[in-house]
């Protein structure tokens, strides 16, 4: 089964080797048929503490690293 990949914004980088990423998705309201923005926060593994608050990054699902961490940051090569 392929690993899920999500894109979001770093909202906290205060922990060692961990960033908190807020991922936003759009869902349709069942009655009013209007699109609503929903967000969820994920703890992601950042091995070298490279990413800072406010940056847009991509995260990939991985094996559990700790109680709350089962995502890792995808480091994309600079173009």
UniProtKB/Swiss-Prot annotation:
Q: Which Pfam families match?
A: Ribosomal_S17 (PF00366)
Record GO terms (molecular function): rRNA binding; structural constituent of ribosome
At the highest ranks, the source species' classification is: Bacteria, Pseudomonadati, Pseudomonadota, Alphaproteobacteria, Rhodospirillales
Instruction: Give the signal peptide, or none.
Output: none
What this chain does, per the record?
One of the primary rRNA binding proteins, it binds specifically to the 5'-end of 16S ribosomal RNA.
Per its record, how is this protein called by name?
Answer: Small ribosomal subunit protein uS17
- A cellular component annotation (GO) from this entry: cytosolic small ribosomal subunit
Q: Does the keyword RNA-binding apply?
A: yes
Source taxon at top rank: Bacteria
Q: Which organism is it from?
A: Paramagnetospirillum magneticum (strain ATCC 700264 / AMB-1)
SUPFAM superfamilies given in the database record? Nucleic acid-binding proteins (SSF50249)
Assembly mode: Part of the 30S ribosomal subunit.
Q: Which UniProt keywords apply?
A: Ribonucleoprotein, Ribosomal protein, RNA-binding, rRNA-binding
Report the Gene3D superfamilies cross-referenced here.
Answer: Nucleic acid-binding proteins
Gene Ontology biological process: translation
Q: Which gene encodes it?
A: rpsQ
Q: Record's family?
A: Belongs to the universal ribosomal protein uS17 family.
């Amino acid at each position: 089964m392929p690993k899920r990949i999500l894109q979001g914004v770093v909202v906290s980088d205060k922990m060692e080797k961990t960033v908190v990423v807020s991922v936003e998705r759009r869902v349709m309201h069942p009655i009013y048929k209007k699109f609503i923005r929903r967000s969820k926060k994920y703890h992601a593994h950042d091995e070298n503490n490279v990413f800072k608050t406010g940056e847009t990054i991509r995260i990939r699902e991985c094996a559990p690293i700790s109680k709350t961490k089962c995502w890792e940051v995808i480091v994309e090569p600079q173009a």
